[in-house]
Amino acid sequence: MIPKIIHFCWLSGDKYPELVQKCISSWKKTMPDFQIICWTTENFDINSNTFVREAVACKKWAFASDYIRLYALYHYGGIYIDSDVFVFKSFEPFLANRAFSSVEYCISSNCYTCNIEAAILGSEK
């Protein structure tokens, strides 16, 4: 079972922009009994992984978070959500699964695609 933990990354140390504040508020509103862990350079040892260290040194926050999100899910389990994702409905129904990922559909007159996304991922520890 997936634990009630929401993970997200904020590595720049900057104040959250208004969009990110609204997104985090949406998580708290839709999943009030979930623990929220914000991964930063203070609580993740960026020197523990060469890729993360180099990404942070170049201020490539999204690259570093690609590793950290998987680290968090592997070691703690829970749900990783990108900081710019607004949630309208609880993910509680997904907790009975061992893992899940998000998908993005693109439907237009000349193409139809379905991409697996890493913006929202969930897994057991």
What do these predicted ranges mean?
Residues 1-49, 125:
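N-terminal anchoring/stem segment of glycosyltransferases
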Residues 62-116, 120:
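GT-A fold catalytic core of metal-dependent nucleotide-sugar glycosyltransferases
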Residues 9, 23, 38, 58, ...:
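Generic recognition of cysteine residues
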Residues 13-20, 58-66:
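Aromatic-acidic/polar surface patches that form glycan- and anion
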Residues 31, 38, 46-63, 94:
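An acidic/histidine-cluster motif and surrounding catalytic segment
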Residues 25-29, 55-58, 120-122:
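Short, low-complexity, polar/charged sequence segments that are solvent-exposed and flexible
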